[in-house]
Design a protein with these regions (language model features):
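Membrane-embedded alpha-helical segments and adjacent helix-loop junctions characteristic
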Residues: 9, 13, 50, 64, ...
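Hydrophobic transmembrane alpha-helices of multi-pass small-molecule transporters
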Residues: 1-95, 212-343, 441-442, 446, ...
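Helix-coil boundary and interhelical linker segments in multi-pass alpha-helical membrane proteins
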Residues: 206-212, 386-397, 458-460
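Short helical (or helix-break) motifs at transmembrane helix termini and adjacent helical loops
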Residues: 113, 152-155, 159-164, 196-201, ...
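Membrane-core helix-loop-helix motifs of multi-pass transport proteins
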Residues: 10, 165-238, 245-250, 422-452
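Membrane-water interface of transmembrane alpha-helices
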Residues: 105-109, 153-158, 230-240, 415-416
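Alpha-helical transmembrane segments of multi-pass membrane proteins
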Residues: 127-142, 167-188, 222, 354-367, ...
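Alpha-helical transmembrane segments
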Residues: 91-101, 143-150, 213-228, 399-408
Length: 460
């Protein structure tokens, strides 16, 4: 039987994406030709707008868009190719690569599941305590391995805890526990440089070390976690008085598992103590990255994980996105675009209270991340606002860190963050339930982040 050809939704979307790319190219050409500013500023503004549109619409994959940054910089004569690609070898990329390698080794040897399971037994079958411990270990593990991997690992444990409850009668409890897993993973990732890509982007931009980030990252987690969980509790009103059975997790301590644990603990201790260690040896540049690279070599050489395991567990696209964001920052500075934007934004916001500026920025980042990759948001906004911060009377470090943390605080939509998407994909959460709880957290966290930036920003 003959059927007429009807464009599928993906085909129509492909047409829309192609149209966006074509219009974006035309806009870039128009800006280069007709903007009335200095030619170099025109180039900087053109590249910024061109890349921003592609990142925000995802008309091209965000990684491909990141690779367009050095390409445009070279073609338009801002940098030569060597200079354009310099930031793709930034030490922060290798630091984050070390985090991927550690996660690969823990997963390969089953130690991630073991640690989670053992902590759960401390609850002694009480659902309330079990949930608190579950959220705590989720946040703690998310500091060291990706929040995506952490959520994927902890979700089965959470579902197992709820297995004996009636999902209809105990709907609020299901929503509280499962959303709590996703939100704990996102919040926990704020704590360290390797916890979430936006952290590394801000750190690379501002030259923040591993220990320096933890000095405020961990306290922020300690503040946001109880606030977030308490607010989620008030919104959902779960019943946590049940008793549950938790399956025992046993593991044979083979040589490989012992070596994996030793590498993990050694790396964490060295990262935490990197500043005093560096000072003791007269100042070792980029010690955090050296530690990460040592961990990668130790993991593969000791055969606790193969190179293929590390390779498959590494999100190379995220690393390329780092490079694109850092190169964009260099372009804005070299072309004078940052100074140009600073003078104009400062004129517009010259009479605005600093807290209002921080509040507006936090709200913009949080709600933008609901629709755009948090990594892409940070890669775009950190270079832009770091360049205009001083003109607005705000420390560039404070503004960059606020953007990075805000990019991890989008809780309303499944597409906002990988943890949200994983929990939603389990089939146990409806989107309207996530939107109701997430909206409350978004609003409260926006205010909290602005307050923290305003009152505690001096420690940065």
């Amino acid at each position: 039987m003959h059927t007429s050809a009807v464009p599928s939704a993906p085909s129509r979307w492909l047409d829309i994406k192609s149209g966006i790319v074509i219009l974006d190219v035309l806009l870039l050409c128009a800006m280069l030709a007709w903007l009335p500013f200095d030619p170099m500023v025109n180039k900087g503004l053109g590249i910024l707008v061109f890349i921003a549109i592609l990142w925000l619409t995802e008309a091209l994959h965000v990684t491909i868009t990141a690779l367009l940054v050095p390409l445009l910089a070279t073609v338009l004569g801002v940098f030569d190719m060597s200079k354009s690609l310099t930031d793709f070898a930034n030490p922060i990329l290798f630091l984050f690569f070390g985090g991927f390698a550690l996660a690969a080794a823990l997963s390969k040897q089953g130690l991630d599941t073991l640690m989670a399971g053992k902590v759960m037994h401390l609850a002694n079958g009480h659902l309330g305590w079990g949930v608190i411990l579950l959220f705590t270990i989720t946040a703690a593990m998310s500091m060291w391995i990706s929040n995506t991997a952490t959520t994927a690992m902890m979700l089965p444990l959470a579902i197992g805890m709820l297995a004996r409850l009636d999902s209809k009668k105990e709907r609020a409890t299901f929503v509280f526990v499962l959303l709590g897993i996703a939100y704990s993973a996102s919040i926990g990732g704020i704590g360290t440089l390797v916890g979430s890509p936006p952290n590394a982007i801000a750190a690379a931009q501002m030259g923040i070390g591993f220990t320096d980030w933890m000095k405020f990252g961990v306290p922020v987690v300690l503040i946001l976690m109880p606030c977030g969980i308490a607010l989620l509790y008030l919104v959902t009103r779960p019943r946590l008085s049940h008793r549950v059975e938790i399956q025992d997790v046993t593991i044979n301590w083979t040589r490989e598992r012992k070596v994996t644990l030793a590498i993990f603990l050694t790396t964490v201790v060295l990262w935490i103590g990197s500043q005093p260690i560096s000072n003791a040896f007269g100042g070792i540049p980029q010690l955090d990255t050296l530690i990460a690279m040592g961990a990668i070599v130790a993991i593969v050489v000791s055969r606790v994980a193969s190179w293929d395991d590390v390779n498959q567990n590494t999100d190379w696209g995220v690393l390329m996105l780092f490079g694109g964001g850092l190169t964009l920052s260099a372009i804005l500075k070299a072309t004078g675009t940052s100074a140009f934007l600073a003078s104009h934004l400062s004129a517009v916001l010259s009479n605005a209270n600093i807290f209002v500026v921080l509040l507006m920025l936090a709200a913009f980042v949080v709600f933008l991340t609901e629709l755009v990759s948090n990594t892409a948001t940070a890669a775009l906004l950190v270079p832009l606002f770091a360049g205009v911060a001083e003109a607005l009377g705000v420390s560039p470090v404070v503004m960059s860190v606020l953007i990075a943390i805000g990019a991890s605080c989008a809780f309303m939509l499944p597409v906002a963050t990988p943890p949200n998407a994983i929990v939603f994909a389990s089939g146990h959460i409806r989107q309207r339930e996530m939107m109701k709880a997430g909206m409350a957290l978004n609003v409260v966290f926006t205010v909290l982040l602005a307050l923290l930036a305003y009152f505690v920003g001096d420690i940065l």
